[in-house]
Amino acid sequence: MPILRPLVIASLVLLVSNACADGVPNDCTQLILAIAPTWNSLRGELRLFERSGGGQWARVAGPFPVLFGKNGLAWGTGVAGQNEPGLRKQERDGRAPAGIFEIGQIFGYDPRLPPGGDYPYHQVTEADVWSDDPRSPNYNRHIVIDPKKPPDNYTHEKMRSGDFAYQWLVEIRHNSDPPVPGAGSAIFFHIRRGVNRPTTGCTTMAKENLVRMITWLRVKGHPCYALLPAVEYDRKWRSWNLPPPETLNRSSGAHAQP
């Protein structure tokens, strides 16, 4: 028995560390938080939060309206959410990935970010592609190709399509490390196409709100995105290190519904 005790203690420590692994990382001081009324909601509210070190979250912008997938939400794969039971995000399911995700690079048509922007940025050309083909070794990756020899899916994978909604693309790092074929790809923040036009999995908003977010982002803030239906936010905000409910000033439609 004395010999087994250290093993038992070590196992308990491992279990505790795993239980605490999910949630906003300690080095994240910029948080984008979106809440949907239900799993099947097409729309919700988004807020921007900041904190110093491990301090309390303070709301710096929002709420403002956003649109999600045309079929609602499903659990994604990122910093947190991948270990939750329930419906999983799949390619072309029309659902936005729920959970917590790191923010990747910003892509866009313009030579540089909007005034005030200071974040890794790549101006896309006709050579820039984001693969959504689960059969491709480059699935859910940004790649640069020879436009004279485009891949089979080039017409819908090219990032400079001329679509005004893609003027700015802020990468949401779902299913990224490494990508699992078929688990969902090309998830971004971008400009909405209309107030009643949900997406196939991205989170969209009015242009002025997207620009506000882009100019706020900083690499040193290790920004993350948390997207949850209200019932999951109410269950997890404390254990996932999210802003407490009293900081949200939620509208009635953003509360958990039975």
Regions found by a protein language model. Give the residues of each.
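Positively charged n-region of N-terminal signal peptides that target proteins for export
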Residues: M1-R5
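Cell wall/extracellular polymer interaction/catalysis modules
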Residues: D22-T199, E208-P258
